[in-house]
């Protein structure tokens, strides 16, 4: 062992799994599920009874949390589904670049410059207008399965 100090910056999730297994029958409305390799929020769950051939089935209707598309899946209720690790983090908005990227201030005082403005028109307008008026804005960033996107905005007053 050397006496040198080893420092590294953790930029990723250190190889942790992006999902965890959960039995289909225990996933509820408002929960999350992975359908077609996309992180989704469950908006409707219906179960069918055990039939002549096999298991009771769960029918999931879910909305992709990043692009808003509706996805559906049918899974036997005893089988495991992938559930994404979904995190929300608040950052203070520092700047908006001309190419559509935002500069955000993290809790430890560093800047995060790798996020684009959201594609949701209403949210995009709120952010641009609020920033143009010189308000202090805090954006909520949702991250799941290696994707990140601004999903909400809070006004914490004038600068």
Swiss-Prot record:
Any Pfam family the entry gives: eIF-5a
InterPro entries: IF5A-like (IPR001884), IF5A-like_N (IPR048670), NA-bd_OB-fold (IPR012340), Rib_uL2_dom2 (IPR014722), Trans_elong_IF5A_hypusine_site (IPR019769), Transl_elong_IF5A_C (IPR020189), Translation_prot_SH3-like_sf (IPR008991)
GO molecular-function terms, A-Z: ribosome binding; RNA binding; translation elongation factor activity; translation initiation factor activity
One record GO biological process: positive regulation of translational elongation
Family the entry assigns: Belongs to the eIF-5A family.
Descriptive protein name: Eukaryotic translation initiation factor 5A
Matching Gene3D superfamilies: 2.30.30.30, Nucleic acid-binding proteins (2.40.50.140)
UniProt PTM comment: Lys-52 undergoes hypusination, a unique post-translational modification that consists in the addition of a butylamino group from spermidine to lysine side chain, leading to the formation of the unusual amino acid hypusine. eIF-5As are the only known proteins to undergo this modification, which is essential for their function.
Keywords noted in UniProt: Hypusine, Initiation factor, Protein biosynthesis
Composition-biased stretches (Basic and acidic residues): 1-12
NCBIfam families noted in UniProt: eIF_5A (TIGR00037)
SMART domains the UniProt entry points to: eIF-5a
Domain of life: Eukaryota
Functional description taken from the UniProt entry: Translation factor that promotes translation elongation and termination, particularly upon ribosome stalling at specific amino acid sequence contexts. Binds between the exit (E) and peptidyl (P) site of the ribosome and promotes rescue of stalled ribosome: specifically required for efficient translation of polyproline-containing peptides as well as other motifs that stall the ribosome. Acts as a ribosome quality control (RQC) cofactor by joining the RQC complex to facilitate peptidyl transfer during CAT tailing step.
Species: Senecio vernalis (Spring groundsel)
Annotated stretches, region: Disordered: 1-23
Gene name for this UniProt entry: EIFSV1
Hypusine carried by residues: 52
């Amino acid at each position: 062992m050397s006496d040198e100090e080893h420092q590294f910056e953790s930029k990723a999730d250190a190889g942790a799994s992006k999902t965890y297994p959960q039995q289909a029958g225990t996933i509820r409305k408002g929960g999350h599920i992975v359908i077609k390799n996309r992180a989704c929020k469950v908006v409707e769950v219906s179960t069918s009874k055990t039939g002549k051939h096999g298991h009771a089935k769960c029918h999931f209707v879910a909305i992709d949390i990043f692009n808003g598309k509706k996805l559906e899946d049918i899974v036997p209720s005893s089988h495991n589904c992938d559930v994404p690790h979904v995190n929300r983090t608040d950052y203070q908005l520092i700047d908006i670049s001309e190419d559509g990227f935002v500069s955000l201030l993290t809790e430890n005082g560093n800047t995060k410059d790798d996020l684009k403005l959201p594609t949701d028109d209403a949210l995009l307008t709120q952010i641009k207008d609020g920033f143009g008026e010189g308000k202090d804005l805090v954006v909520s960033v949702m991250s799941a399965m290696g994707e990140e996107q601004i999903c909400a905005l809070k006004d914490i007053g004038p600068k």
